[in-house]
Amino acid sequence: MVGAGIGLRQPGNVDEERFLGVALEMLQNGNWLIPHRAAEIYPDKPPLFMWTIALFTRLTGAPNLALFLPALIAGVVTTACLYDLGKRLWNRRIGVIAALLFLATYQTYSVLRAGQIDGFLCLWIMLGLYGMVRHLLLGPAWGWFYVACAAMGFGIISKGVGFLPVLMLIPYAYAVRKGWPGVVRMPGQGRAWWLGLGVALAAIAVWLLPLVLYVTLYGDEASRAYVSEILLRQTAQRYANAWHHQEPFWYFFLKVIPKYWLPLVLALPWLVPAWRRQLSKRDGRVLVLLGWVVLVLLFFTLSSGKRKLYIFPALPGLVLVMAPLVPWLLRRWFAQRPRARKVFIGLALFWFAAWFARGFIEPIKEHLNVRQALMAEVAGMTQGAELMLTHWREGQWLFARQPIVHFGMDAAHQTQKAADWLRSNPTAFALIQADELAQCFKPDKARKVEDDSAGEWFLVQGDADNGQCHERSASAPFRFAWQLPHL
């Protein structure tokens, strides 16, 4: 169901365009340690996800397919792991229920059908969760613990929060200290526990060690700034003092969970008292799993930066602790209501069928990416001449069909710099937003092009200069051109 329509999908938002573009640029320029976006360093994420897209692009020859394969694989692995853990912790029936609950949840499709990094992160979180549960609740199993540690390391170089499964040690330590049944005690194993940290660091070093060596030996100011950005600003500083997606502390509980964790949230009025009873009976399995879910939610709640997909890593733990209660819930609801039971089965089948059908309907309905249409028209109007981009988004770079020039995605005074650049490049064009056109150019000499989701755009050349802008850039512009047709 997660893979329905995968061959029809294409990048549809800036995140998908960005990650696919970075992966394709890696294939083109051969720089695997430092990601680039239109020749400018992309500092926001480590490169493991982009490596994976590049690998699948090389294997399949289909970038639009390669973009969505990591999340699809993550969905398959997560479903299989949930089934196996449910079977081992309780029985085969509970394993099936856990897998179905995961596949029934709205957020599963919202995340795993997108070509974004959070679907790929789910793979490492689930492997970390699986290894920790096998060790802490079904162990001792040191091999699985080290698998979990390696997965967390790879999760960290995918997206910084890949360490989340380690939070399971907190409720586990409490359960061990209080003597709760259902958890495995492993006294006198301090060295083995610390070895897990070494395994996680070794996984991180797969990327970080070559990066540091490269920057130390051959790096310039930009690459050194990248190391500082990715290790400090994009991790601890972004968590403690987020500058994007700022939301109040109640955001996840009032705006995200009621919608994106459907239909699971509908059962919470019965589940919460049942969990309380299980905890009163000192069930260590429930304490560790439910405690981990609460800690993950708390972790993201404490950060001022919040997006709806951030809490997705908690979902596998939630369905695993819910699954044993589902048979009891179904008996409670439908034992004396055979007609209601038939309605419930019908609704469940419709729910799964609707998500499967939507996988094919959405890509057909969305059809061509608006920025792809924009850049195709621009290439035709300019006859493939050099193009200066201003206030651009990733789709304009990804779908460019001609050489592009820019002063940096977040540079100041981009329109003014474009006007100055055109004076020394009279055969080139610049793509200017409508609301900034009159600042530096004569509107009557500008040509309007296809609108995209970012608004109206106009093409100008040096003859449209109104002489009002004199903002010379202190640095040379970035230049980039796709060497081969890629999409």
Where are these regions (language model features)?
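Specific aromatic-rich, kink-prone transmembrane helix
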Residues: 81, 121-138, 318-321
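Short periplasmic/luminal acceptor-recognition loop of GT-C membrane glycosyltransferases, typified by
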Residues: 351-445, 449-464, 476-478, 483-484
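Transmembrane-lumen/periplasm boundary regions of multi-pass, lipid-linked membrane glycan transferases
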Residues: 19-24, 151, 163-282, 292-304
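Transmembrane-helix motifs of polytopic, lipid-linked glycan transferases
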Residues: 69-89, 127
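Transmembrane-helix signature of polytopic, membrane-embedded enzymes
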Residues: 82-104
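Short acidic/glycine- and proline-prone juxtamembrane loop motifs at membrane-interface regions
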Residues: 68, 110-121
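Membrane-interface transmembrane helices that cradle and orient dolichyl/undecaprenyl
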Residues: 88-89, 93, 128-145, 326
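Extracytoplasmic catalytic/substrate-binding loops of multi-pass membrane glycan-assembly enzymes
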Residues: 8-24, 31-34, 40-52, 62-65, ...
